[in-house]
Amino acid sequence: NRSGFSSAITFLTPLKHKKFAENFYSLNGTPVDCVKIARNLLCPFEPEIVISGINPGPNLGSDAILSGTVGAALDGRNWKYPSIAVSVASFEIVDFSFAAKFISKVLDNLDNLKLENFQILNINVPDHNKFPDPKIKITKTFLNEEDCERNYESSDRKNLEDGNISISPIKIDMHSNSEYQAVEDWSKISL
């Protein structure tokens, strides 16, 4: 379980990988370690996409930025690969088969679906035992409760609660024009 690991990487601890089959490995590190080691050491070809997960427990709203699953997708995006984070909305004994089948269908149709480099999709799949016939909804991820409450019908949280598969495009941009203007005078401080 790497909940709350976000974009953490391992320092000062040796990382070990185990090969299960051709191009199938496990690693004792964080989700972001997995992307970096796969990209730099293990993958003999250029990946078309990074898929992080499937993990138990949803990654919704502000929790998404704390997620190791989403963190690994962000790292894939930093390598200029389209990336998908996938979670099943259950902390109990989780059956990943429905989510795996859904992602398999996504991959089968990848040429027909629009997923650009630098794009991240955060996909939350409902517990298939509780919601056996979900719809697919394109949703929004809100980082604060006020925005989520104002836009609840379109939120990832609401649609997952309704038993739907929530697909939220995520864009991370650290630059903010409005805040840039607000602190521009700071450069005039005498040293």
Whereabouts are the PLM-identified features?
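Electrostatically charged, flexible surface regions
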Residues: F98-L191
